[in-house]
């Protein structure tokens, strides 16, 4: 969901989320090349994506579960470490979906900034890097599942170099 139309985009879902025990992901800052054209503009003294985070925070604070994280979660970019650092430092109860692990300039170290000190509170997502892991030059095409599994394992191994899960 997008917060860029205001808090009334999120409010209608909060009661339903509580009743059904579901979660909602709100996109704050994306990983695509031109995201900064809008999401990194200044809104007063804040960047637009941080102003959006404040809007999300007002709703998410009311929906913190036993885990310590809110049912209203956020999406942040794997290729912009500063955004993940700011989100984790400022909003301890945000669960962060770190999108774009396989984008240019993204890496496991960047992703590590979205996790809390216990190695919780985030999940890193790679799309094409796993779905397109099969290499036609190295295979006859029947082992695409194995190739995807190996790509996911490499991603996990790389993340665990920077994130300690307690």
Per-segment meaning from a language model:
Residues 110-117, 121, 130-166:
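C-terminal helical cap(s) of enzyme catalytic domains, especially alpha/beta-barrels
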């Amino acid at each position: 969901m997008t917060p860029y139309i205001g808090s009334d985009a999120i409010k209608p879902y909060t009661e339903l989320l509580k009743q059904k025990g579901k979660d909602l992901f709100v996109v704050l800052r994306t990983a695509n090349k031109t995201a900064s054209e809008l999401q990194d503009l200044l809104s007063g003294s804040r960047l637009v994506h941080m102003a959006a985070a404040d809007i999300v925070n007002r709703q998410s604070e009311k929906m913190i579960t036993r885990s310590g994280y809110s049912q209203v979660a956020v999406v942040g970019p794997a290729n912009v470490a500063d955004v993940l650092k700011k989100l984790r430092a400022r909003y301890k109860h945000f669960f962060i979906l770190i999108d774009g692990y396989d984008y240019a300039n993204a890496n496991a170290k960047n992703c590590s900034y979205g996790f809390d000190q216990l190695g919780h509170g985030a999940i890193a997502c790679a799309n094409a890097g796993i779905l397109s892991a099969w290499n036609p030059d190295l295979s006859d095409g029947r082992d695409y599942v194995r190739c995807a599994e190996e790509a996911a394992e490499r991603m996990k191994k790389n993340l665990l170099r920077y994130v300690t899960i307690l």
